[in-house]
From Swiss-Prot:
Tissue: Testis.
Entry protein name: Cylicin-1
Description of how the protein assembles with itself and partners: Interacts with proteins of spermatozoa head including ACTL7A, CCIN, FAM209A and SPACA1; the interactions may be necessary for proper acrosome attachment to the nuclear envelope.
Basic residues: bias regions: 495-505
Clinical note on disease: Spermatogenic failure, X-linked, 8: A male infertility disorder characterized by a significant reduction in progressive sperm motility, and aberrant sperm morphology. Patient sperm show head and midpiece defects with deformed and detached acrosomes, and flagellar defects.
Top-level taxonomy: Eukaryota, Metazoa, Chordata, Craniata, Vertebrata
Region (8 X approximate tandem repeats): 532-553
């Protein structure tokens, strides 16, 4: 272990006793107070084995004490030192004398720290007095007295430095207040920087003087290095006089706390001055940015407001124009309409139709009414459908005749037939739209309104084109229907002719098939020599293979072979007319037939056997019908279940 660890241990003259743990104490008490009675006699044991006198037992602890008392002094001292070094740090902490500590900590209790500071300014802290009193009691050597005097001087210097720092802190606060009132912030920055540099220099000088006695608790490694490198008289005193170790530790700790407190005050003042300067610069920058943003935002808002106002004015103008047009229309409709609601509806519908016919007159008289009429044209189409449905009612016919003086002929036609009216209305709308487009264009050029009317004219032209296309499609559909009927009649006639021809060809094929069966033997002999086959034979084999797939159980007869040859001829004729069959097919039966025909000629082949009759079951085995079968024996029943509802639910 290192030397500074030993400094914490209090080595005194009266520490001769070896410490005992609680477990060892309990065991020692049990052994010490246990009464030793003689063992009871047992049967079969010899009297010689029993001790004649009761043996007085001595505990191990007492034996160790006796041995240690007999040992020389230097041996048991070394032994005790070894034990102390081997102990864990808990025991050393327990054996340490509690050091002198202040009743407050500088970080948590700032009010107490300020109170102590005011006392230091007036004169001598109570800490110094206590340290002097204790120094007088312990300091017996002249070297220790010198050390105490040096420490008191250093403490006085350290007390002066925080006064300077506090004075500088006040100056920085004053500079901050002046900078807030005055716009010149550069002077305050330079003052704060100079003050911070001075504080740093003072703190460095004070650290150099107090490095010997700074024992920080958080950095024990640094303390070890300082204790090795420093050649202070503390190590000599510790080696010579072990009694003065406690005093030195107490004085050192009190000095550490006072110095640490002063250093903390310095750092606190420096940090405050820096923070104030930084915050002020940030606030000034933010203020400039905010002012710039506000000015830009105000300009943008003004421009936006101007745009919005212009848009609102335009919208209001448009709305006013629309309202005027609507009022004109409503006035005209109200004048023409009767008292009842039904008559008003009819008048509106009829007026919309009249407007289409009278667009020529209206455009010359009222050029502004073109906007409203375009909207009315759309409504007129929707209303025309309603009029067609409502034309069946007799009441509406009478109302329409009263109101529409100019369109008497149209109303009479609508009352007669609704279908004819639809066609006529479409034609009239086309012609009126075309005329209105031309008149609208002329009127818009005269009244300096070319844009709106030209668009309406284009829309009317498109609608007219669509209607004309629909009529053309209807005519084409009728023509196509007539042509399809004619074609279907021709196809039926042709099909009849083809069916007759096929019947005649079948008769010829049957005659040819008989001749072909006789000539097949010669053809197969030639195919065995050359190794090639004609298309008719391949097709015949294909048909046979397909039939064999459908009939796997039964074999073919001689009569069926004639039918297959006839079918092969039919397919050969069809191939000449139209399409050609594929010469290869991947069927298993086809390959087997090819292999057999290649080796053995068909003349030498055995005739196919007749179809076997289906094997009937033997008469001995009689299968009983399920309906006549006796019922199965009943299953063994278990014990009856208790009549509980939850059991039935589970089942």
């Amino acid at each position: 272990m290192s030397l500074p660890r030993l400094l914490k241990v209090n080595i005194r003259t009266y520490d001769n006793s070896i410490p005992i743990s609680e477990s060892s104490r309990k065991s020692w008490n049990q052994k010490h107070f246990a009464l030793t009675f003689p063992k009871p006699l047992q049967r079969g044991t010899n009297d010689k084995s029993r001790p004649l006198k009761s043996q007085i037992t001595v505990t191990r602890h007492d034996k160790r004490k006796l041995e240690e008392g007999q040992k020389p002094a230097h041996k048991w001292i070394r032994h005790s030192f070894r034990k102390i070094l081997q102990w864990p740090p808990i025991y050393t902490a327990a054996r340490e004398q509690t050091p002198f500590r202040h009743l407050y900590t500088s970080k948590t209790h700032l009010k107490k720290a300020e109170y102590k500071k005011s006392k230091d300014e007036k004169g001598g802290t109570p800490l110094k007095k206590d340290s002097k009193k204790k120094g007088g009691s312990y300091a017996t050597n002249p070297e220790s007295k010198q050390i105490v005097e040096e420490k008191t001087k250093r403490q006085n210097e350290a007390d002066k430095t925080p006064l300077k720092s506090s004075h500088e802190n006040e100056q920085s606060k004053k500079s901050k207040s002046s900078s807030e009132t005055n716009p010149e912030s550069q002077n305050s920055k330079t003052v704060s920087k100079n003050c911070s540099q001075k504080d740093k220099k003072d703190s460095k000088n004070s650290k150099k003087t107090n490095t010997e006695f700074l024992h920080t608790k958080n950095n024990p490694k640094k303390d070890l290095k300082r204790s090795k490198t420093s050649n202070d008289p503390i190590s000599e005193i510790c080696s010579e006089n072990s009694l003065n170790v406690d005093f030195l530790m107490l004085v050192g700790q009190s000095d550490d706390e006072s110095i640490n407190f002063d250093a903390w005050l310095r750092n606190y003042s420096q940090n405050n001055s820096k923070n104030y300067s930084l915050k002020y610069t940030k606030y000034t920058k933010k203020d400039t940015k905010k002012n710039a943003k506000k000015s830009s935002d105000a300009e943008s808002e003004d421009s936006k407001d101007a745009k919005k106002d212009s848009k609102k004015v335009k919208k209001n103008v448009k709305k006013d124009d629309k309202k005027k047009d609507v009022k004109k229309d409503t006035e005209s409709t109200d004048a023409e309409s009767g008292d009842s609601k039904d008559e008003r509806k009819d008048t509106k519908k009829d007026k919309k139709k009249l407007k289409k016919d009278d667009k020529k007159k209206d455009t010359k008289k009222y050029p502004e009414s073109t906007d409203t009429e375009s909207g009315d044209a759309k409504d007129a189409r929707n209303d025309s459908r309603n009029l067609k449905k409502a034309s069946k009612n007799d009441d509406k016919k009478k109302d329409a005749k009263k109101i529409t003086f100019s369109t008497d002929s149209e109303s009479e036609l609508e009352s007669k037939e609704s279908q004819k009216d639809e066609k006529k209305d479409k034609k009239d709308s086309k012609t009126d739209n075309k005329k209105s487009v031309k008149n609208d264009e002329e009127s818009t050029d005269a009244d300096s309104e070319p844009k709106g009317d030209s668009k309406k004219g284009k829309k009317d032209e498109k609608k007219g084109k669509k209607d004309s296309k629909k009529d053309d499609k209807k005519k084409d559909a009728k023509k196509n229907a007539e042509s399809t009927e004619m074609e279907s009649d021709l196809e039926l006639k042709k099909d009849k002719k083809h069916s007759k021809e096929k019947k005649g060809s079948k008769k010829d094929i049957k005659k040819d098939a008989r001749k072909d069966t006789e000539s097949t033997d010669a053809e197969f002999d030639e195919s065995s020599k050359t190794g090639f086959k004609t298309s008719t034979k391949i097709k015949g084999s294909d048909t046979e293979s397909e039939e064999s797939l459908y009939k796997p159980g039964a074999k073919k007869k001689i009569d069926e072979s004639d039918g297959t040859s006839a079918n092969s001829k039919m397919e050969g004729l069809e191939s000449k007319r139209g399409f050609r069959m594929s010469s290869k097919k991947t069927t298993f039966n086809e390959k087997g037939e090819k292999a057999s025909t290649g080796r053995v000629p068909p003349s030498r082949e055995k005739p196919p056997l007749p179809a076997c009759e289906p094997s009937l079951p033997s008469p001995k085995v009689r299968r009983l019908c399920w309906c006549k079968m006796p019922p199965p024996p009943p299953k063994p029943r278990y014990a009856p279940l208790p009549e509980a509802p939850w059991i039935h639910k589970l089942l």
